[in-house]
Design a protein with these regions (language model features):
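Canonical tetratricopeptide repeat
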Residues: 66, 73, 97-104, 138, ...
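Terminal, low-structured helical/coil segments at or just beyond the last alpha-helical repeat
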Residues: 310, 314-356
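Residue-level recognition of tetratricopeptide repeat
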Residues: 35, 69, 107, 141, ...
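Start-of-helix register in tetratricopeptide repeats
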Residues: 28-29, 62, 96-100, 134, ...
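Register position in tetratricopeptide repeats
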Residues: 39-40, 73, 111, 145-146, ...
């Protein structure tokens, strides 16, 4: 009898162990999938998965951090900060992870205009870690928002000194442009152009810089050189150059080539939709937008969804435009342009927003 009871207990123990092991494996898969979805731009799904990981107690600090990043991408900055605070309060937060979380929290504080809190995090990072180009740039952004122009300039110079790339020059230029200080940012673009192009990527990057400077002739020259060396991304940007020059015929050709050659044609479909809108062919524009949405992610998805609103408005289908604007703001709640557009559309369809 004792032997039978022992056998039964062992069976229960084994079953419990297998169940726990199965749950543990499932939780681990969920956590890994969350990281993949975050990387792929599936932010709402990633957020749900990270919240599941938090509830299961799986890598708490990392899960809170992941949820915070997903919230940031969705424009929910205060919720992001809450997650970052929770992550920092966890028992086991490695030095490298803490640096990462503080950087994200500072960026989130910047978004909600909590400049003092953002600068406090930047100062903590400067005191506790070796500064790199990203931290210098972030500190410069915060200082610029606080109208501390000398401090901002010093940090931007350090950032570019650490990372004298075309991307960094464009990033600094964009920060100054937002403050209507374009001249201060242009010198970084000029510094980037002082380098000699060595390959197709360099020609593409130089084309980008010239495009931001609205020097379309030089932009086109550089992009054509990149295209001659099989740089596919240059096709889409050259299409935008032609659009800005009001040459929609050549623009359409570039976007069509991009769709046929790129691994993900979303950017090309978006460009074709712009050409259709220019021609007044709104049904074709919607068709191209629909094709683009099927494969788009990140910023390109946002641009496609924005253009979809515009097309319905151009078609005078204000009811659908209103619906699309409301759906858009659920994904990108910080977009002030669409918020204004939503208010206009409500007047067109006589809808009162009960949430306001």
């Amino acid at each position: 009898m004792k032997s039978k009871r022992m056998g039964a207990l062992l069976a229960v123990y084994c079953l419990s162990f297998m169940t726990l092991a199965g749950c543990s494996a499932e939780n681990s898969r969920n956590y890994k999938q969350a990281a993949q979805d975050l990387k792929n731009g599936n932010y709402e799904i990633a957020l749900e998965e990270y919240e599941t990981s938090v509830a299961a107690g799986v890598k708490l600090a990392q899960s809170y951090r992941g949820a915070g990043v997903a919230q940031m991408k969705l424009g929910n900055y205060e919720d992001a900060i809450t997650n970052f605070n929770n992550a920092l309060a966890c028992d086991k937060v490695g030095r490298k992870l803490k640096k990462d979380i503080l950087s994200y929290r500072a960026a989130a504080y910047l978004k909600i205009k909590a400049y003092n809190e953002a600068m406090t995090d930047c100062q903590t990072l400067a005191e506790s870690y070796d500064m790199d180009a990203d931290l210098y740039f972030l500190t410069g952004e915060v200082a610029l928002a606080m109208d501390s122009y000398e401090e901002a300039g010093s940090n931007f110079e350090q950032a570019y000194g650490e990372d004298a790339t075309y991307d960094r020059a464009i990033q600094i230029y964009g920060a100054y442009l937002e403050k209507d200080m374009e001249a201060d940012g242009t010198r970084y673009l000029e510094a980037a152009l002082s380098k000699t192009a060595k390959n197709a990527q360099d020609h593409y990057d130089r084309g980008r810089v010239y495009y931001y400077m609205e020097d379309y002739d030089n932009a086109a020259d550089e992009l054509k050189k990149a295209i001659d060396s099989d740089n596919t991304e240059a096709l889409a940007l050259l299409g935008m150059v032609y659009m800005d020059q009001e040459d929609s015929e050549n623009a359409r050709t570039m976007f069509q080539k991009y769709v046929s050659q790129a691994d993900n044609g979303a950017k090309g479909f978006n460009g074709l939709a712009l050409c259709d809108m220019e021609a007044g062919d709104y049904d074709s524009a919607l068709s191209n937008i629909t094709s683009g949405i099927q494969t788009a992610d990140g910023e390109e998805m946002q641009s496609l969804l924005f253009n979809e609103i515009v097309v319905y408005e151009k078609k005078l289908d204000f009811q659908t435009a209103l619906q699309k604007a409301q759906e858009y703001l659920e994904l990108y709640p910080e977009d002030k342009t669409v918020k204004k557009e939503l208010a206009f559309l409500k007047t067109r369809v006589n809808v009162t927003d009960t949430q306001d």
